[in-house]
Amino acid sequence: MDKIIKTISENGSFRAYVLDSTETVRTAQEKHQTQASSTVALGRTLIASQILAANEKGQTKITVKVLGTSSLGAIITVADTEGNVKGYVQNPGVDIKKTATGEVLVGPFVGQGEFLVITDYGTGNPYNSMTPLISGEIGEDLAFYLTESQQTPSAVGLNVLLDENDKVKVAGGFLVQVLPGAKEAEIARFEKRIQEMPAISRLLESDDHIEALLAAIYGNEPYKRLSEEEIRFQCDCNKERFMNALATLPKADLEEMRDQDQGAEIVCQFCQTAYHFDQNDLEELIRDKS
């Protein structure tokens, strides 16, 4: 079971979220059949969305779009406050060579572009905010977004580690944010600790990477665990939603599908579930337009 643990320093100056997103990213890889670089890039973006959604309340949905310039294309993920996240990469079969040490490159793979966040509070007026991709590594781009767009100094670490067969071995990350009222000396102390943290990949390889992340973030600083919440890859698509989408097509197009194709098939981009609509389904839509 994947989870996010929310914590706060005992003096109330900082909050930290740590995540185990291994099954989330593994499910995404299985559904989309992504190559190594695509898996890591999509996985990091899924984790980034989980972090942003964890900061929200109510029935809020967070859409993250990584709009890079490379052949990978766009990465689009959607997370909600119930712990669900879904996502896809435009070109999952694109890959680049690993480094000599076996590291999967993401920054050069994503390229330059924009980091777009759409916050939907369910009011019909979603809020859009965009910052440039500063590295394409996703974690650094999220930290820059939070600092620039939300005016909240933040440190972010997230990664996806693959095994020798390029299957997801472990995935997770952390967010540390300064809270109002933090003193300069406290900020400096935490900044130093974050700078001296082991690489996120090393921490994720620990037997208990959640505890390893918390220990690296807080050191000897006392902190409180506020909550532990389940997170998962879960798409909310259904046949009715795609039926409604078909209903928006011109009558002539529906008749062509009925007569020439004997039906229609729509595949959800987010989870690759295929929905089949037979001639009777199409006939129903055609009658509604008569």
From Swiss-Prot:
Which key words tag this protein in UniProt?
Answer: Chaperone, Cytoplasm, Disulfide bond, Redox-active center, Zinc
Q: Where in the cell is it found?
A: Cytoplasm
Pfam family for this entry, one:
HSP33
Any one of the GO BP annotations: protein refolding
Q: Which GO terms describe its molecular function?
A: protein folding chaperone; unfolded protein binding
Q: Which GO terms describe its cellular component?
A: cytoplasm
User: What coarse category fits the chief subcellular location reported for this protein?
Assistant: cytoplasm
User: What disulfide bonds does the UniProt entry report for this chain?
Assistant: C235-C237, C268-C271
How is the protein altered post-translationally, as described in the entry? Under oxidizing conditions two disulfide bonds are formed involving the reactive cysteines. Under reducing conditions zinc is bound to the reactive cysteines and the protein is inactive.
Q: For this UniProt entry, which segments traverse the membrane? A: none
NCBIfam families membership: PRK00114.1
Which family, according to the similarity comment? Answer: Belongs to the HSP33 family.
What does the UniProt record say this protein does?
Redox regulated molecular chaperone. Protects both thermally unfolding and oxidatively damaged proteins from irreversible aggregation. Plays an important role in the bacterial defense system toward oxidative stress.
Q: What is this protein called?
A: 33 kDa chaperonin
Source taxonomy: Bacteria, Bacillati, Bacillota, Bacilli, Lactobacillales
